[in-house]
């Protein structure tokens, strides 16, 4: 799982990037779902940049049409600090009873 230090150093520790070049990290969960953490920065002044944390449904849930209208996104939270980002990740994991794969 990500630590505060990982989030603070996101440019070095995140394992992917968006098509817009924004740092992104994926956490794959035992349920088949995934957690996407993106540093939203493209076209945003540095003082207003933030992290988005999205829980994506599993392939099976998507194929069943469960989250088709939301493009597979179950929930989204946003945060501006590393601590708030970690709190959002933990809140999603607790609320949806998820475990890292």
Give the role of each language-model region.
Residues 9, 15, 42, 63-64, ...:
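Detector for Asparagine
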Residues 12, 32, 42, 94-97:
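Intrinsic disorder/low-complexity segments
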Residues 34-65:
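A short, structured beta-strand/loop element
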């Amino acid at each position: 799982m990500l630590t505060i230090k990982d989030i603070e150093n996101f440019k070095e520790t995140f394992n992917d990037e968006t098509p817009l070049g924004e740092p992104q990290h994926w956490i794959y969960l035992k349920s088949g779902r995934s957690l996407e953490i993106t540093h939203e920065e493209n076209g945003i002044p540095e003082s207003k940049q933030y992290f988005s944390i999205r829980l994506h449904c599993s392939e099976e849930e998507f194929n069943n049409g469960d989250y088709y209208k939301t493009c597979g996104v179950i929930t989204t939270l946003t945060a501006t600090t590393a601590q708030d980002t970690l709190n959002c990740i933990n809140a999603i994991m607790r609320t949806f009873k998820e475990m890292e794969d």
